[in-house]
């Protein structure tokens, strides 16, 4: 029930954000949204566990539930989107027509492939981060402190910086810049694989990767929002974001095999090269947007 309600709320919030924000606000809006998501993860994860050491779980859950009052108040105070289009009245208008509208667009298949492949390199590089670091001799405490502490800070900084850069340089340029940075950042793990148990390099690798990935995520989310027809934001954004899970499915099976067969150094080189398909699809950006959102 909690998962169902949470997913439903995510769809509504994503649709509202897409409808309310102006095109030039999509980048910063995506950055702030991801910031809120990360803070929520920190609050419901680390902070909740710290509180659970000092009070009963019943009280902790009540406090977590009480924190939702902030979100409720924000929802009440949030402005309604200014839409001229009528709201859907039938299942066809709400579900079928959004799909038909999207797939009737020029380059729809290429857009979907771009969504699947744009962050393939990041997903590959991070899929085996913990086993990789354990094999190098780092303790679970070391890994947890750096990935959950520094990693989260770097991700938040990356998303906020990425959102600001999207607003300043434009969507197309940002997707190119961050796509390349994401690929290059995975090579920090290659350097760590060559150095072995080297704590400063481990900190640097995780920090750099999370920073660049955060910037890429901000531009990626802003681009998805820009693709939505404002008459069908909820359905279309749900369709586009659901494809992000396909990337993890693609990566899930071969990662362990590649690392075991070819070794960590080759694996991270392959991870960096995995950015190429997404960047090749990005060459068709103007075709998708008709030259808008550049």
Region roles according to the model:
Residues 80-112:
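Juxtamembrane intracellular "pre-TM" segments in multi-pass secondary transporters
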Residues 157-174, 259-260:
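Helix-to-loop junctions at the C-terminal end of transmembrane segments
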Residues 18, 23-32, 140-141, 230-240:
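Loop-to-transmembrane helix entry/capping segments in MFS-fold secondary transporters
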Residues 180-197:
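C-terminal ends and interior cores of transmembrane alpha-helices
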Residues 66-85, 281-286:
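C-terminal membrane-cytosol helix-exit motif in multi-pass small-molecule transporters
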Residues 27-48, 52, 241-252:
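Glycine-rich segments within core transmembrane alpha-helices of 12-TM secondary carriers
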Residues 106-145:
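Extracytoplasmic gate region of multi-pass secondary transporters
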Residues 7-21, 215-229:
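Intracellular juxtamembrane helix-capping segments at the cytosolic ends
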